[in-house]
Amino acid sequence: MNEKELIKYFRLLGLEVHTSTKARGHQGFYMRKRIDISKNISQERVIPTLLHEFAHYVHSEIEPFIEKNGGSLEVIFNDSEVTCYEEELLKVTNIVDAHSKCEKLIYHRNIIKNKISEYEKIIKQRYPKFMRSKKFKEFDKYIKKSEARYLLKYDRVKLISGVIFKKSRLLTIDNIEKDFTDMPCEFAAYIRLKSCQKRQGRVSAKINRLKKYYSKPTELFARFVEGLYLAPEQVKNTAPYTYDRFITLLNEGYYPFLKIVINMFLQT
């Protein structure tokens, strides 16, 4: 199977196919019978991406408004019990797209978590009753009179003073001890702890967004179809229940126009 053959078939179905766009920053993008493939992806990713986006089109033919709600596995597999499908499809997704595991982000979050624990230990050496969830009254009393209070909001801030002859002073979270020589080490640790908590929140939010995206039924289905091309035997072994149901529905004609495409690279 080659990409020209695939694109020709898609266009015969009335689909617009573009292979020289930015695809809205993605490898590929499907919307309202239009498939965009990024001009920036490698040649080996073109066919898998075409199949992925075509799977979205097929899904949209059996279930409307998937762009808004992500669709449902109940419709995709014409079954009311979908727990097994979901579990297997998530495993397939991890095979097809390593980014779906969020390993780098989780690793980064764990590093931040360890730093938070280290700063907490420093604080508790002098304030054993300190709790992250409670107000740190001793710190609050000190910080009100210190320019270091700006570091609670920003890791790096430039303070400008003077009306005619302006002076600037750069404060950073890395130079607290140098910039504020009178500050107790426990308070410096608390400022860094609060900074780490903000970073941890941002990383966790990104992980949650990615997991929500990858677990959308339409994305699970698209990566399943993509996986059948990239690693058919591995997909069969990883998702036997889903594969059997998919092949049954495929042969019954449940998925519009998909059987011809699947038969180009897979014996069903």
Located regions from the model:
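Pan-zinc metallopeptidase signature
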Residues: 103-268
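Short pre-active-site segment immediately N-terminal to the catalytic Zn-binding motif
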Residues: 31-51
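Active-site recognition of the HExxH zinc-binding catalytic motif
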Residues: 48-65, 222
